[in-house]
């Protein structure tokens, strides 16, 4: 028992550290929060184990606050999944309400939302109804099984039918450009923020040139290769004062693409 209590405290401390650090850092990348996956999973499994193995007098009884939090959160997630395809199919009507130019352009990206994207939300809603029935009849094993099965199918469906289309809206144009340069001997750089997309999708081997990731060198020095830059439309001000020559070669869904022209 003491070992379990000590492990639980250690896991809780780790989760708190991750949450605090992730709240402080400015660059919000999912990899930074991945350390929270194990503590969250452990604590959830521990709570379910206690729920299923509770004493006969307490068996199947869920604290009112936990029950309310669980069903409210699940219902809100299901509602978002169900409403999202209708929202995304009609972005032309309200994209102008957003002040950020990148958000506007991203929402207006040509992505085919069919309506089937609501399926994860419907599965979650159905599972929520079944689980509510089992909670009322105090059947903890059935509650746990329904929860696990519902979340497995909901997550799998969301990753399959929703997330790829969200990716097309937010980063699709940039990824398409990077992939078009994968077979060209060139430099590609992202201006105005940190990104790994140019490194991954251009499929470039690690270069011998130590300046390959130096934006100042790529923008102002002689590179000897075609040099391309990608920047979000709401960050074009970062190019103000640039004394070199760049030619805009395209823009799409909130991204602007430039090629640097070197002086002879």
Features from the language model and the residues they span:
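Membrane-embedded architecture of ER/inner-membrane glycosylation machinery
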Residues: 7-8, 12-264
């Amino acid at each position: 028992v003491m070992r379990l209590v000590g492990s639980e405290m250690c896991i809780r401390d780790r989760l708190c550290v991750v949450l605090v650090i992730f709240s402080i850092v400015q660059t919000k990348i999912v990899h930074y929060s991945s350390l929270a996956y194990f503590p969250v999973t452990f604590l959830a499994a521990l709570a379910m184990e206690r729920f299923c193995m509770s004493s006969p007098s307490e068996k199947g009884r869920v604290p009112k606050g936990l029950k309310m939090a669980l069903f409210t959160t699940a219902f809100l997630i299901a509602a978002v999944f169900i409403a999202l395809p209708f929202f995304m199919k009609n972005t032309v009507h309200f994209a102008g309400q957003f002040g950020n130019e990148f958000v506007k352009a991203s929402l207006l990206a040509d992505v085919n939302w069919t309506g089937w994207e609501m399926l994860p939300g419907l599965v979650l809603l159905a599972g929520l109804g079944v689980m509510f029935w089992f909670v009322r009849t105090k059947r903890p094993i059935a509650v746990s099984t329904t929860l696990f099965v519902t979340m497995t199918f909901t997550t799998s469906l969301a990753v399959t039918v929703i997330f790829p289309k969200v990716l097309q809206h937010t980063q699709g144009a940039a990824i398409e450009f990077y992939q078009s340069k994968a077979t060209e001997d060139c430099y590609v750089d992202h201006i105005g923020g940190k990104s790994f997309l140019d490194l991954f999708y251009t499929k470039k081997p690690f270069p011998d040139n130590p300046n390959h990731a130096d934006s100042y060198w790529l923008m102002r020095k002689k590179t000897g290769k075609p040099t391309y830059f990608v920047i979000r439309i709401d960050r074009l001000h970062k190019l103000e004062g640039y004394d070199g020559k760049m030619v805009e070669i395209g823009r799409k869904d909130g991204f602007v693409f430039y090629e640097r022209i070197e002086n002879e």
